[in-house]
From Swiss-Prot:
Organism name: Homo sapiens
Family: Belongs to the PNMA family.
Taxonomic superkingdom: Eukaryota
Lineage, opening ranks: Eukaryota, Metazoa, Chordata, Craniata, Vertebrata
Tissues expressed in: Expressed in the brain.
InterPro entries: PNMA, PNMA_C, PNMA_N
Protein name as it appears in the record: Paraneoplastic antigen-like protein 6A
Gene that encodes the chain: PNMA6A
Amino acid sequence: MAVTMLQDWCRWMGVNARRGLLILGIPEDCDDAEFQESLEAALRPMGHFTVLGKAFREEDNATAALVELDREVNYALVPREIPGTGGPWNVVFVPRCSGEEFLGLGRVFHFPEQEGQMVESVAGALGVGLRRVCWLRSIGQAVQPWVEAVRCQSLGVFSGRDQPAPGEESFEVWLDHTTEMLHVWQGVSERERRRRLLEGLRGTALQLVHALLAENPARTAQDCLAALAQVFGDNESQATIRVKCLTAQQQSGERLSAFVLRLEVLLQKAMEKEALARASADRVRLRQMLTRAHLTEPLDEALRKLRMAGRSPSFLEMLGLVRESEAWEASLARSVRAQTQEGAGARAGAQAVARASTKVEAVPGGPGREPEGLLQAGGQEAEELLQEGLKPVLEECDN
């Protein structure tokens, strides 16, 4: 979803999202001078702005740019599109409001005017005197940008892939948001609703809707959404979801606690579809942990003892055991690193002292002659320091 991308990018850059604009659809061959000129022409009424960065979006096959304003977005002045190379560039900003409360006000103050009615008639219907008509008109003008911001909010991106690509949404998330937006777009023409729906589709999903509309151009956006739900919705059979539960295993690089959470999602789904009895969920969870996960020796031993005793941990109990095991592993790793660093430092110090002992300076008493006692003392001292430095390492080896 473009608004989510804007918010995440602003958060990463440390910028207030309400002062940020996301410009989408910029061609790769658009040079910086042309880009800056187009922005200045379109955003001049918004005041000073700064381009914070650019990134290529594969789903659009175009570049996106993050722009920071010197003040919060003025919803009455911000353009929805910027004329530029390759066609208009879309402008995304954080809506000032969301929800039906302002949409309701929009219906009161906006739609009557579209239908040729006067604000005065609305005032009369609300039981407000004509002297307050100007007040009502000002409220309508103030609310309208908020309503328009909600109505013009774009959909997220769904392509039909099993694993959504970066910038795409899973079907469940996309379906929830799209269903809500179709309700918000009640005052928009059906043709425009279909166009906005197609904007949020890529790949297989887009091809499917194109085929549906080619077969029957009169299909509504709601009809197309229902068809997408039939194809990409959760239609797994009991046998399929049961197999997924019984074959789930910890992936390479996946934390054990993350596997427990992923396995629980599958178990809950299987129980909802009655592919797995609730009474057997704990037993299946324990079996998958013992056969499909990478366990530390203490945790493996503890779980096997529980199975032999006929005591299968619940989800929360299993998660608690796993997190204790992960904490123990982390503590052990820190301890090993600390001992290794301490031993390395001691060895380096001992070696330095040993080298220094071989370079005892000559004293008066003959060229090339060195006092025997000094050599013996230096050698003995170096040996003592060496033994002292290696002591932690030797103890570690003994242990």
